[in-house]
Amino acid sequence: MSTKKIEQWEIERYWEIFASLSNGQPHLNSSQAASVLRNSRLRDEQLEKVWDLADVDGDGELDFEEFCVAMRLVFDLVNGELQEVPRVLPDWLVPESKAHLVQAGRALSGRPEQFERIEDEDDTPGLKDGFDWYMNPADKSKYEEIYSANRNHRGEVTFESLQGLYDSLDVPDTDVRSAWNLVNPSASPAINKDATLAFLHILNYRHEGFRIPRTIPASLRASFENNKIDYQVDNARPAQKWGADGSTETLTGRKTKFGDTYLSRLGVGGKGSYTPKGTDFSDTIQDEEWEKVRLRRELAEMEAKLDAANKASEGRRDRPRNDGRPNWVLIKKEALQLLEYKERELRELREGTGRAKEGQDLERLRDDIKTVGDQVEGLKAHLAERKDVLADVRRQIEEERLHR
């Protein structure tokens, strides 16, 4: 059993960040959370997977527990504790209050057990048995693109909004309505995201020649009947999902892939030119925690380079070069360049420019400023020492010349 856990000091740090972003609300939407998550410099697909894992209840927002999960995953990725985003949320990261939701999600994401199927009375020739509720990642991504392109301001999809899709499919109207009724047991005018994905999955299989199922798993039916899920589409459109490769073969290998024609018309599918309309966070205020992480990483890189330079310098010192004398001109030039860089970095931190964006909490950056200041003073002392050594070498050279 894993002994890992989120420590109390981490929870307190995450709470400070959460409170500063939530404006007193109990949840963060995608726009608010992205202002700190994107500062980790992780790739968009990694952040998307982190969000999907952390959003345990699937409401499109992060409460404080889910935010802690997301932050720990991101920090572990940044610090090298994780090489990639895990496929499922580790048990030690699952919030106790949401353990039942994680268990249900895992049951739905895998291949569920096959339920006994009532024999279809449809006499349409050529239809096949073998409908599978499992959605592979490529199909699910395409379903989510269709959902995103047709949802209303409440995050729901109406039957009429998908008429363009129906026209592009080889599915009779009666079967389309049968699939709609199957995922809409309450006969509502619109269905939520989970029901929409299941509806599109049924149409996909029917388009490929499979019979429409007569029943749905109880766990899915419960999620269809729950209309309280709020995906917060008013706040921000979610980032574009990675679509399936257009070269992937269909189930039959004979028809256009489900939804490709429809998505192409919308300009959001396959290899189209669709770009997400989400908020641009490129000018968002940098979070000091990420700044500290990056500074530590840069410091480690600089120390490694310094060690390598020292070793190379020692190697050159052991070899006869320029009458056995070290290249003090080059050493002085490099030391001055490093000093100039550190002074500029310190000046930017004090003035709030450059990496330290306007509006940063300067109180939290004092430690970083002090560290950089100490480095600058150390470099100045080192430069003075090198100058003394250089003067001494010149003096020795001059004395040697006079003795001759």
Swiss-Prot record:
Locations listed in the record: Cell membrane; Endosome membrane; Cytoplasm, Cytoskeleton, Actin patch
Every EF-hand domain range: 42-77
CDD domains: EH (cd00052)
Source species of the chain: Aspergillus clavatus (strain ATCC 1007 / CBS 513.65 / DSM 816 / NCTC 3887 / NRRL 1 / QM 1276 / 107)
SUPFAM superfamilies for the chain: EF-hand
EH domain location: 10-100, 139-227
Keywords carried by this UniProt record: Actin-binding, Calcium, Cell membrane, Coiled coil, Cytoplasm, Cytoskeleton, Endocytosis, Endosome, Membrane, Metal-binding, Repeat
Region of interest (Disordered), ranges: 306-325
Metal-binding keyword on record: yes
Bias (Basic and acidic residues): 306-324
Binding locations of Ca(2+): D55, D57, D59, E61, E66
GO CC entries: actin cortical patch; endosome membrane; plasma membrane
GO BP: any one term: endocytosis
Family: Belongs to the END3 family.
UniProt function note: Component of the PAN1 actin cytoskeleton-regulatory complex required for the internalization of endosomes during actin-coupled endocytosis. The complex links the site of endocytosis to the cell membrane-associated actin cytoskeleton. Mediates uptake of external molecules and vacuolar degradation of plasma membrane proteins. Plays a role in the proper organization of the cell membrane-associated actin cytoskeleton and promotes its destabilization.
Recorded GO MF terms: actin binding; calcium ion binding
Organism phylogeny: Eukaryota, Fungi, Dikarya, Ascomycota, Pezizomycotina
Membrane topology: Peripheral membrane protein
Coiled-coil positions: 280-399
Name this protein carries in UniProt: Actin cytoskeleton-regulatory complex protein end3
Cited Pfam families: EH (PF12763), End3 (PF12761)
Classification via Gene3D superfamilies: EF-hand
Assembly and oligomerization: Component of the PAN1 actin cytoskeleton-regulatory complex.
Gene coding for it: end3
